[in-house]
Amino acid sequence: VGTSSLRRRAQLLHRRSDLRVVEFRGNVDTRLEKLRGGVAAATVLARAGLNRLGRTDVTGVSLAPEDFLPAVAQGIVTIETRESDGEINPLVTALGDPKTQKCADAERALLFVLDGSCRTPIAGYATHETEDLWLRGLVVAPDGSQAFAGERHGAANDAAAMGADLGRELLALGSSILEALR
């Protein structure tokens, strides 16, 4: 399976230790060409990216985010502004989705406590239905040999606290993995 993501590699190997995961870099066309060329038998691509490119010819299996956790805040689009910009900030704030913001708050708090980056196999996924928020988090050894998962459920207004709490739990469980990566 071809992927350049350490998080995806670790999750794949945790689920299927018999897989051989190879480095796959490049845009969608480059990755698909490598696939056709036999560099790998499969690859992991974002469905949103394929849809955006109109690539209806690419078929495969969708990995449910509940089972194959994404990177923290993956898929959330944001606009960054200067804090002091009193003219633009109200306009941008009006564009925001409060439920998505709560999910981002929970996921980012989780990542902050774990001191994660794109070079750490950490995943987080929050969903906000009704007034409640569900948060799942995961720390996986790069070789897939160990994984520590946890989840929280509670009031969406406590999103950041839930994320930090889950982060502390996963830090205690997966500290050996995270220390080895630093």
Annotate each PLM feature.
Residues 1-18:
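Bilobed "Venus flytrap"/periplasmic-binding protein-like clamshell domains
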Residues 18, 22-182:
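Small-molecule-sensing regulatory modules
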